[in-house]
Regions:
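Hydrophobic packing position at a conserved site in alpha-helical tandem repeat units
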Residues: 17-18, 36, 49-52, 56, ...
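Solenoid-repeat scaffolds in large eukaryotic assemblies
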Residues: 42-45, 58-61, 76, 96-100, ...
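RNA pseudouridine synthases
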Residues: 153-341, 345-351, 413, 418-420, ...
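Short coil/turn connectors between adjacent alpha-helices in alpha-solenoid helical repeat scaffolds
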Residues: 53, 87-97, 133-146
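Pentatricopeptide repeat
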Residues: 25, 29, 45, 58-61, ...
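N-terminal mitochondrial targeting presequence
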Residues: 1-20
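Pseudouridine synthase
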Residues: 245, 249-256, 291, 302, ...
Length: 444
């Protein structure tokens, strides 16, 4: 896996411009948090948070967060989640563990009166800190273990409430299903019935990493209601001949559940999901099997403790850079009004200036970040990405297939090529989809 350091790119930590030696007092704490958040949102707060460990009470920090955001409760929640999340990066710091627990308790205590409640990120970050603290030798082990269990129970109740009757019905249905103890070979064979590109990259008792095919939705939501399918249809699809032009719109979560793979319950929208990649994007995605691991993964993504690389195929000619000189660099461009940073490097140039293959690493995790940064930051929209490509390069791609038909529907040239989370032993590389090869061979 290639890291940002190997790309030779200087990365920026979104953070407050305040000096690390700045002496924070109870009077200046609101301004301190405000500047950190305004310069880098939660990333900025995570960086400066250690400087307030052991110096202020939970009441002080909650009050300062509301003052810093002028009672914008969404932003105040972001600050508090960032402070709690930062504690997970300092597991051996007893002040950090105690602060996370006290912040959680204080926030819960005022939630009804202030109409300002913790959310699933709060629960996940708090559990991650307390669970880690319970594993350190000492007199507080049992205390933190009990606290972690309490927070996890709260998270589960919160998720069930948000999920409503449909979620409860689904969980009840899954609990009655007979277990399917597939061997590794049987699982691989079962996955291949749905797509040749679908494969397990890593799996243990707590999580699973999948190479998701391009064109397959991760899970069905309100926007994909028409694509929802019944178990009967799902079974029919899995029994169908490979290669059939089948109209069933299968989600990755549907398939994993049908194969009997256990998934966590804390995401009220979709079991197991802790991060997302778009329908048209292929590649590595991790799903949680247990609620405990769900919390830990949410915290890992929240604190930017995950390395993600993408491969993108883009035009050689830029619509904003007349020099068309490109090698490597960084893209510092807001996405959806929020700070976003990516690093990139050209890893292949195709003959006759037809196309470039880029390696992109995201330093933040905004929706459509790579797609926006390629299109608007580099002036090179990803091939087939109709949402951000108003040019005609898609014609060039279609000409390279003898009979594209539906084969390119809901697909574009963006692939999550690698995923690394050191804490959980994840370091995987995902092969590019088979359909990429058909076109890449044509433009060589």
């Amino acid at each position: 896996m290639i890291s940002a350091r190997q790309l030779g790119v200087k990365t920026r930590a979104f953070a407050s411009s305040l000096s690390d030696n700045y002496q924070v007092t109870i009077d200046t704490l609101p301004n301190f948090l405000e500047e950190a958040y305004s310069n880098g949102e939660t990333d900025g707060v995570i960086r400066i948070a250690p400087s307030i460990y052991g110096k202020f009470s939970a009441d002080d920090i909650v009050s300062a967060s509301l003052q810093a955001t002028k009672n914008n409760k969404g932003q105040a929640a972001g600050i508090l989640n960032a402070v709690i999340g930062s504690c997970s990066l300092h597991k051996s710091n007893s002040d950090a563990s105690l602060l996370a627990w006290n912040l959680y308790c204080t926030w819960e205590a005022i939630s009804d009166e202030m109409e300002f409640s913790p959310d699933i990120v709060t629960f996940c970050n708090t559990f991650s800190v307390l669970n880690a603290a319970s594993e350190y030798p000492g007199d507080d082990q049992d205390f933190y273990k009990a606290c972690a269990a309490q927070v996890l129970d709260r998270a589960q109740r919160y998720s069930k409430k948000l999920g409503g009757s449909k979620r409860r019905k689904l969980l009840n249905t899954l609990s009655r299903r007979p277990s399917k103890n597939h061997t590794a070979i049987q699982q691989i064979d079962a996955l291949k019935k749905f797509s040749d590109d679908l494969e397990i990259l890593f799996e243990n008792d707590d999580l699973i990493v999948i190479n998701k095919p391009s064109g397959m939705v991760l899970f069905h939501s309100k926007t994909t209601t028409n694509g929802k399918i019944s178990r009967k249809k799902l079974k029919h699809f899995s029994d169908a001949q490979k290669g059939e032009d089948n109209h069933f719109d299968l989600s990755l979560v549907d398939i994993l559940l049908e194969l009997g793979i256990q998934l966590s319950t804390l995401n009220n929208e979709a079991l197991g999901v802790v991060h997302r990649i778009d329908r048209g994007t292929s590649g590595a995605i991790v799903l949680a099997k247990t609620d405990e691991m769900h919390c830990k993964l949410v915290t890992a993504f929240f604190t930017r403790s995950v390395d993600k690389n993408y491969v993108a195929l883009v035009p050689w000619k830029s619509c904003i850079d007349e020099s068309n000189q490109i090698d490597q660099g960084q893209i510092d461009l807001e996405v959806g009004g929020r700070p976003a940073l990516s690093t990139y490097k050209v890893i292949k140039r195709y003959p006759d200036n037809k196309a470039l293959q880029l390696l992109v690493q995201t330093q933040t995790g905004r929706k459509h970040q790579v797609r926006v940064h390629c299109a608007k930051g580099l002036g090179r929209p990803i091939f087939l990405d109709t949402l951000y490509d108003d040019r005609t390069e898609k014609v060039f791609i279609h000409e390279k297939l003898s009979n594209p038909g539906k084969s390119l529907e809901n697909k574009f040239f963006l692939h999550a090529s690698s995923l690394r989370i050191d804490e959980f032993g994840i370091d995987v590389t995902a092969n590019i989809p088979n359909w990429w090869h058909d076109i890449l061979n044509e433009i060589e």
